[in-house]
Amino acid sequence: MFIMKKYIICMILLVLLGGFTFFEENNNKSFNIDDLYDYQKEFKTEEIDVCARAGAKTYMDYRMTTVVSSRQYQFIHNELTVDKNTGFLYDKDGFIAVALGSFYGEIGDRFYFTLDTGIVLPLVKAEEKADQDTDAMGCYHLIDTSIIEFVIDDYYAGNYFWNNGNGLVLNGNYNNYSLFKGDIEKVEKVLEERNDKYVTYTYNYDIPKDIDIFNYASGY
């Protein structure tokens, strides 16, 4: 009994101090990046404003959120799973974790962002961009103009996507990867009620067998 209690205490300490996520078994859906090429909307939505059409899509490692008592830390560590292939974090319905400005809701709110290529990105707000770092509306980052900032495990992401040897995944911008390239065309807030029938969106693009490498000088 003593050994079992000691084991449990050690596991709790590992979670709190190590800053990692291991709750895969609690999620109902696995994540496959190729599903985004032919995505099916499962939930009813309401269309909301597109605050800007910026194409830049940056990222942050989820370990940068360190305040254990914060809503975002608790959400990341209790509601999300790390995909050990791509490094994305996702929720039980396959929505990808992102940081958004205060313009777009609260931690845990979910959205469909449609790009001008037709790609639909199912996103869940797991972190919030600081108001002092965004425009007056809380929409986009003042320095890089990004609205979408993926919350990732940069170890796995760095192995899956290219980094040019500079340590930055996709030169710091997921817009450099063919699937995510494009401006924001439409934003819908996801409601809890599911659609009676899925709505299918198909992106007419041959899925590359190898990872495409796009080197855009500055990375944006």
Identify the meaning behind each predicted range.
Residues 1-36:
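Gram-positive cell-envelope targeting signals
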Residues 28-220:
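Solvent-exposed, well-ordered loop and adjacent helix/strand elements within mature globular domains
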